[in-house]
Regions:
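C-terminal motif of bacterial Sec signal peptides marking the signal peptidase cleavage site
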Residues: 16-19
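Start-of-domain marker
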Residues: 23-86
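A beta-strand/beta-hairpin structural motif
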Residues: 90-93, 100-116
Length: 160
């Protein structure tokens, strides 16, 4: 009887968590990279959208094997007649060599802003990203970038 009484609040809490949805998040998806990102692996996300103004961000999950304190990314967004290509530079550390998104575990989640207040049209939106990190004395990107576990894309309604 006591066990049944304990299950009821647990089940209610679980139902509440599952039913909660952040109305500002229009799209969220991750792709697992199994700990390394090859330079030829262009990650692609496709989502349907209605006309709106959005904020687009990447979420990188890294571990202690990631050898750099920054990352360079090349992204492209195709929506309607728009096709925008950008280079993104992101520093994981501040001037004091502290990670911006430091966490207790060895896995770090970093949210990288790609576009703020971006107007998308109704229809299919295609987003692609690849890494372009290289050593200082090289013009070629790293063949394999260790320590990258997952790459995610989050599209949220803009506050403006």
């Amino acid at each position: 009887m006591i066990k049944q009484k304990l299950y009821i609040p647990f089940i209610l809490a679980l139902i509440l968590l599952i039913s909660c949805k952040d109305e500002n998040i229009l799209y969220l998806d991750f792709q697992n990279l199994n700990g390394n990102w090859h330079k030829n692996n262009e990650i692609e996300f496709n989502f349907e959208s209605s006309e709106s103004v959005v904020d687009i961000s990447l979420i990188l999950r890294t571990d202690n094997l990631y050898p750099f304190s920054n990352i360079f990314l090349i992204s492209s967004i195709k929506n309607g007649n728009k096709n925008e290509i950008d280079t993104i530079s992101y520093a994981f550390e501040n001037d004091n060599k502290k990670w911006y998104d430091a966490q207790v575990s060895s896995i770090k989640n970093s949210k990288i802003s790609v576009k703020k207040h971006f107007k998308i049209d109704s229809g299919l939106t295609n987003f692609k990203v690849k890494h372009a990190i290289r050593y200082l004395d090289s013009i070629m990107p790293q063949t394999k970038l260790d320590g990258i576990l997952d790459v995610g894309l989050i599209v949220e309604k803009s506050n403006k």
